[in-house]
């Protein structure tokens, strides 16, 4: 059983008082637990719609909560299943029309709400939040919004009873460095910025390494470049079942201890 921290208890308490809650906490601190506590371990007191930015995240949440035996549905544009479940995982765009027309849930959770400032998707987020029915409580979650208090003030100007809950302690300390600070001298055969950077970081014992790419194609291309360039003295051995699960292309790359991850992969491959 997870014992919630004080800030998580404060957020849940505010929700139970009927307030909108804007949570600002670092990645991994436990923002999702606020909703899970409100949901009473899968037995929520009303209808909840938990929105996430991508279909991949929606599928992950669906699988996670269903594995606990929770009654969960999903709506992501390409998939609509069990829409009347007490908990619905969705992309926000699939819910926008319902919210604007006053058909909102008891609680709308917007995970990674910093997308309100996104050039392409921000308008949908802003409209959904601004026009959500007053009977729908809002729970906004993020760790990368510079001015969460401004968001609270904006919600209050809309006539909503909103509060901010902040937690600044990172579960894992964050350290920053620059490629020039890495001391490892590269073999001449390693070419390209990212293969060189990864080789240096691994030599300085900074692995595992996670690199974010802007598009699916970039993700696979970058992974191939790194896999081809890095020395591989200890190939990863995969079973026949594992190779069949992820497919030949990704399996071959995994043997070099390099992989890619995006929404185009099956849930089993991503897991």
Q: Each PLM stretch: what is its role?
A:
Residues 1-24:
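Conserved pre-motif I regulatory segment
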Residues 30-40, 121-126:
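Motif I (Walker A/P-loop) of helicase-class P-loop NTPases
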């Amino acid at each position: 059983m997870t014992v919630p921290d004080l800030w998580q208890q404060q957020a849940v308490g505010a929700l139970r008082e009927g307030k909108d809650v804007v949570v600002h906490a670092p990645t991994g601190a436990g923002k999702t637990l606020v909703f899970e506590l409100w949901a009473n371990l899968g037995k929520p007191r009303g209808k909840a719609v938990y929105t996430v930015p991508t279909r991949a995240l929606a599928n992950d949440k669906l699988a996670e909560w269903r594995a606990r035996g929770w009654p969960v549905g999903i709506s992501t544009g390409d998939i609509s299943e069990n829409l009347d479940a007490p908990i619905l995982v969705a992309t926000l765009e699939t819910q926008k029309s319902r919210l604007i027309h006053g058909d909102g849930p008891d609680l709308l959770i917007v995970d990674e709400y910093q997308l309100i400032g996104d050039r392409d998707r921000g308008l949908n987020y802003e409209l959904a939040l601004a026009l959500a029915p007053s009977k729908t409580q809002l729970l906004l979650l993020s760790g990368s919004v510079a001015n969460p208090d401004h968001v609270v003030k904006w919600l209050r100007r809309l006539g909503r009873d909103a509060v901010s809950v902040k937690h600044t302690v990172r579960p894992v300390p964050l350290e920053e460095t620059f490629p020039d600070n890495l001391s490892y001298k590269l073999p001449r055969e390693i070419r390209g910025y990212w293969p060189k950077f990864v080789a240096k970081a691994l030599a300085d014992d900074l692995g595992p390494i996670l690199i974010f790419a802007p598009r699916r194609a970039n993700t696979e291309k970058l992974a191939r470049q790194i896999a081809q360039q890095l020395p591989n003295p200890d190939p990863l051995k995969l079973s026949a079942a594992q190779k069949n699960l992820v497919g030949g292309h990704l399996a071959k790359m995994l043997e070099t201890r390099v992989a890619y991850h995006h929404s185009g992969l099956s849930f089993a491959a991503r897991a």
